[in-house]
Amino acid sequence: LEYETKFNNRKNYPDIFAQFKYVIENMKNPLNGLYYHAIDVSREAFWCDKVTGLSQQCWLRASGWFAMALLDTLDKIDNSDHKYDAECKMLEDAFVDLINSMLKYQDESGMWYQVVNYGGMKNNYLETSGSSIMAYSLLKGVRLGYLPESYREYAEKAIDDQIDKLNELKDKYSEIINLIGTSWDDYNKKLKYSAEIADMTFTEME
């Protein structure tokens, strides 16, 4: 969209908005306001529902990326002539709704789980990068005026908890926890990444 704004006279704005509209209308779970991770319009992928084409999971990072995309698009769009008022309203409503839905699943620690709506599931875990994405979306949403100032505390809580989880191990190691597989289907093995000053070592934990 930024390219379209600066160099292409907004010619492909309609296509950009159409893609957002498709996701909003087809990938949102109406029961909890979360978005499914993926959709296969052919209904042929092994992971998809054969009726809807949707995956089964609401994945934290995917939800965060979508929140960022909505917000960053709103930030960069040129709507000075009000030609795209309806589209901007669509994106704003989707962003605010997604944030409010995600806040229902924020853990008391301040972070979110990898599979957002299964916080109590065995081997699900509080995920660092996705929680950072959500903190970014919350803070930028507040700064741009799409979210109330009170939402800042949710972002700060997520950031504070991640800082607390960066632990110094003795005097040689730094441990970054909660860096394991990108899918909850791969939880049979977990990786603990121990970063030594001289080099990186990987210790596999059963």
Regions from the language model: what does each represent?
Residues W47-M68, D85-E87, L91, Q106, ...:
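Solvent-exposed loop and edge beta-strand segments that line ligand/cofactor-binding
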Residues P14-Y36, V41-F46, E92-G110, Y154-K172:
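Long, well-ordered core segments of solenoidal/helical folds
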Residues N123-L126, G130, A135-Y136, K140-E206:
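CBM-like carbohydrate-recognition segments
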Residues E4-K11, F20, D49-G53:
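Active-site cleft segment of glycoside hydrolase catalytic domains centered on the general acid/base Glu
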Residues L1-N9, W65-E87, S132-L147, E206:
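Well-ordered alpha-helical scaffold segments within catalytic/enzyme domains
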Residues R10-P14, D85-K89, D93, E149, ...:
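Short, solvent-exposed positions on alpha-helices
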Residues Y13, F17-F20, G64, L71, ...:
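Extracellular glycan-targeting catalytic surfaces
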Residues N29-G33, K76-D85, Q106-W112, L144-E149, ...:
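Surface-exposed helix-capping loop/turn segments at secondary-structure junctions
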